[in-house]
Amino acid sequence: MFTMKKSLLLLFFLGTIHLSLCEQERNAEEERRDDLGERQAEVEKRFLPIAGKLLSGLSGLLGK
């Protein structure tokens, strides 16, 4: 009986550790996905003003 309790306790402990590691890995993957979206938004924010200035400069040159 004691060895069976010991085995069940060991399985429970190992299962808890496994679930904890899976949760950490899942959180890390979600953070990577979030970072990618934030990076794309930052690039868009940087690109749009530069593109606007470039187009206005080109239209000024072509209009002369």
Swiss-Prot record:
GO cellular component entries: extracellular region
Residue span(s) of the pro-peptide: 23-46
Segment forming the signal sequence: 1-22
Places the protein is found: Secreted
Biological process per Gene Ontology, one example term: killing of cells of another organism
Segments crossing the lipid bilayer: none
One Pfam family per UniProt: FSAP_sig_propep
Protein family membership: Belongs to the frog skin active peptide (FSAP) family. Temporin subfamily.
Function: Antimicrobial peptide with activity against Gram-positive and Gram-negative bacteria and against fungi. Has been tested against S.aureus (MIC=1.25 ug/mL), B.pumilus (MIC=2.5 ug/mL), B.cereus (MIC=15.0 ug/mL), E.coli (MIC=1.25 ug/mL), B.dysenteriae (MIC=5.0 ug/mL), A.cacoaceticus (MIC=15.0 ug/mL), P.aeruginosa (MIC=5.0 ug/mL) and C.albicans (MIC=1.25 ug/mL). Also shows a weak hemolytic activity.
Protein name: Temporin-ALd
